[in-house]
């Protein structure tokens, strides 16, 4: 909005360590789909559209490493998903000194409770990647078979930043 200007955007910014479960494994999947190629052209005063339909089958096996699922019921799942991807290249073993000056959430959802969400994310990504191998103007997935195997789960505290702001006397955080 026009009245939401940069001079008063940030009320407070706070570093917060959020607990995550990191799932690694693989998903073997296959899709049956309908691929459609559409061609449109004009001849004289007429516009023509030609559609060609194709039966499509794809299968594949995708490996996943460290798919994050937040382990706190206090954090919004969609908000946590929106700050991905995380850079794991500089992850280190936990040291309490890292928490100095930061807030930290504790996990209250164990790895078994978070597993369905991890599997859903892995399976949706596998389906989407299989679909993306279909080179048609549009692709309608008709069936999707999958088998997911989680091979490893690790616990991690990942640093995030929360931004607090007020707009029209209503508090928001991002």
What is each model feature region?
Residues 2-171:
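Charged, low-complexity helical/coil segments in non-catalytic cytosolic or luminal regions
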